[in-house]
C-alpha cells in the first residue's frame, strides 16, 4: 500500500494533515537503545510549521507521544508507536479545492487512482506525513551514532538560482541551524531569505536543492543489484513530497568527464586504511559504501499550492481558475532539511542491521 519503508528497520507512517493526528510505527528497532521524547522532539521542532517568516504560518507544536515500545527510557525491541496530534487545521480554507484541482498537486492523480480523495489539507499527500519519518529518523540517528559514530548533516545548497558555497567535509549542524533558511553560507543565506520572503508576498513559491553528507559510514553497507545503497537512498529521498531529482557524488556533472578524470584513485593512509584520493563516487561504489563520506543532493520543486491565480479544471472537467487559500510554505527547503536527514538515517540504519545480520562485521 506504499505506507511501509525499510526491510529490517521498518517504518509504517499513518495519519492525514487535517485528521486527528499523524505518526509512525517502527518495527525492528534493537532493544536497549536509550531514547526519549525530548530527543525526538528536537528533530520534530526543526521541521514543524510556523517556525519563521519564510515557512507556513500554520501553528502546530508537533508534540510527540511515545505510545509503546519504550520503557524507562530504553527501547524494548518491540514495535515503537509515536503519535503527533493535529491542533491547528483550518479545513474551511480548502472548500474551493473540494471541486477544483490544484495544478501540479496530487489532487487530480489521487482522484484518478482511487475515485475519491480527502481534499482537506491534501490528506496523505500533505507534508505532515513526514512527521512520522522524522520521528523514526531520530531513533535511527541514535542507533547509527552509538554503533558506528555516523553523523548526518543536511543543508540548503541552492534556492532557485542562488547557490551557496559549502564544504561538505567540514560543515556542522550548528552552522546549518544558525539561520532560518538552514544554509551555512551566511552571505547566501540572507539573499535566500530575502528571495523567499519576496516570493511569499507575491503569493508564489520557489524550489531548490538540499545537499546531505553522511560521515563515518562503515564500509560494506549496501546489497548488490536491486538494493544498492544509492538506489535505496534515491528511493527514500524521492518518496519525500515535492522531490524532483536525486544526485550522488559527481551526479550529472560526472557525464562531462572522462574515465581517467572521474575515477577515484586508491591510496593507503598512515593508519593502513584503503582510501580514495577524490570522492566523485560520493562514498558508494558498486552499490556498497566504501568508507568515504556519502554526499547526495535532492531537488525540490516549488510548492504547488500558491495564492496566485492559475488555470485549472473541476472534478467534472470544467475549465476554471484557482487562487488557493490556506497556509503553505513559499519554499519547502528550510523544513526539508530534517526530512532529508531522516530518510538518510532510515536507509543507513536499515542497511547497517542487514549488513550485521549477514556479515557480522559491524
Swiss-Prot record:
> What is the E.C. number?
4.2.3.5
Please cite one Gene Ontology biological process associated with this protein: aromatic amino acid family biosynthetic process
Can you state the subunit structure given in the record? Answer: Homotetramer.
Q: Where does NADP(+) bind?
A: 47
Q: Which reaction does it catalyse?
A: 5-O-(1-carboxyvinyl)-3-phosphoshikimate = chorismate + phosphate
What cofactor does this protein call for? FMNH2
Q: In which pathway does it act?
A: Metabolic intermediate biosynthesis; chorismate biosynthesis; chorismate from D-erythrose 4-phosphate and phosphoenolpyruvate: step 7/7
For this protein, the record's PROSITE patterns field holds:
CHORISMATE_SYNTHASE_1, CHORISMATE_SYNTHASE_2, CHORISMATE_SYNTHASE_3
- Give the keywords, sorted: Amino-acid biosynthesis, Aromatic amino acid biosynthesis, FAD, Flavoprotein, FMN, Lyase, NADP
Checking HAMAP family in the record gives:
Chorismate_synth (MF_00300)
**Record-level Gene Ontology MF annotations:** chorismate synthase activity; FMN binding
Q: Which CDD domains match?
A: Chorismate_synthase
Q: Name one GO cellular component term.
A: cytosol
Q: What EC class is this?
A: lyase
Function according to Swiss-Prot or TrEMBL: This reaction introduces a second double bond into the aromatic ring system.
**SUPFAM superfamilies found in the cross-reference section:** Chorismate synthase, AroC (SSF103263)
Question: What is the species of this protein?
Answer: Gloeothece citriformis (strain PCC 7424) (Cyanothece sp. (strain PCC 7424))
Cited PANTHER family: CHORISMATE SYNTHASE
- Any idea which positions bind FMN? 124-126, 286, 301-305, 327
Q: What name does the UniProt record give this protein?
A: Chorismate synthase
Q: Which family does it belong to?
A: Belongs to the chorismate synthase family.
Amino acid at each position: 500500500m506504499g505506507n511501509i519503508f525499510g526491510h529490517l528497520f521498518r517504518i509504517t507512517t499513518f495519519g492525514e494533515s487535517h485528521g486527528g493526528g499523524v505518526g509512525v510505527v517502527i518495527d525492528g528497532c534493537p532493544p536497549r537503545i536509550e531514547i526519549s521524547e525530548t530527543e525526538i522532539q528536537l528533530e520534530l521542532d526543526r521541521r514543524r510549521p510556523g517556525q519563521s517568516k519564510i515557512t507556513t504560518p500554520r501553528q502546530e507544536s508537533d508534540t510527540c507521544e511515545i505510545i509503546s515500545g519504550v520503557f524507562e527510557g530504553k527501547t524494548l525491541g518491540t514495535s515503537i508507536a509515536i503519535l503527533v496530534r493535529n491542533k491547528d487545521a483550518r479545513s474551511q480554507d480548502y472548500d474551493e479545492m473540494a471541486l477544483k484541482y490544484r495544478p501540479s498537486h496530487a489532487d487530480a492523480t489521487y482522484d484518478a487512482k482511487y475515485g475519491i480523495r480527502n481534499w482537506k489539507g491534501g490528506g496523505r499527500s500533505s507534508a505532515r506525513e513526514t512527521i512520522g519519518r522524522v520521528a523514526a529518523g531520530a531513533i535511527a540517528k541514535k542507533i547509527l551514532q552509538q554503533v558506528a559514530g555516523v553523523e548526518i548533516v543536511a543543508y540548503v545548497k541552492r534556492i532557485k538560482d542562488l547557490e551557496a558555497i559549502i564544504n561538505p567535509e567540514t560543515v556542522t549542524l550548528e552552522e546549518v541551524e544558525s539561520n532560518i533558511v538552514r544554509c551555512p553560507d551566511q552571505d547566501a543565506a540572507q539573499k535566500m531569505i530575502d528571495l523567499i520572503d519576496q516570493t511569499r508576498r507575491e503569493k508564489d513559491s520557489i524550489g531548490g536543492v538540499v545537499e546531505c553528507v553522511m560521515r563515518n559510514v562503515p564500509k560494506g553497507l549496501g546489497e548488490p543489484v536491486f538494493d544498492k545503497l544509492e538506489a535505496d537512498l534515491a528511493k527514500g529521498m524521492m518518496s519525500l513530497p515535492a522531490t524532483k531529482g536525486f544526485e550522488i557524488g559527481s551526479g550529472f556533472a560526472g557525464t562531462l568527464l572522462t574515465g581517467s578524470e572521474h575515477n577515484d584513485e586508491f591510496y593507503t593512509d598512515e593508519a593502513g586504511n584503503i582510501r580514495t584520493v577524490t570522492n566523485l563516487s560520493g562514498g558508494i561504489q558498486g552499490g556498497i559504501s566504501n568508507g568515504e563520506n556519502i554526499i547526495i543532493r535532492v531537488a525540490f520543486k516549488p510548492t504547488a499550492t500558491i495564492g496566485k491565480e492559475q488555470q485549472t479544471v473541476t472534478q467534472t472537467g470544467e475549465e476554471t481558475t484557482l487562487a488557493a487559500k490556506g497556509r503553505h510554505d513559499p519554499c519547502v527547503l528550510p523544513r526539508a532539511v530534517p526530512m532529508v536527514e531522516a530518510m538518510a538515517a532510515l536507509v543507513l540504519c536499515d542497511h547497517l542491521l542487514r549488513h550485521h545480520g549477514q556479515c557480522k562485521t559491524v
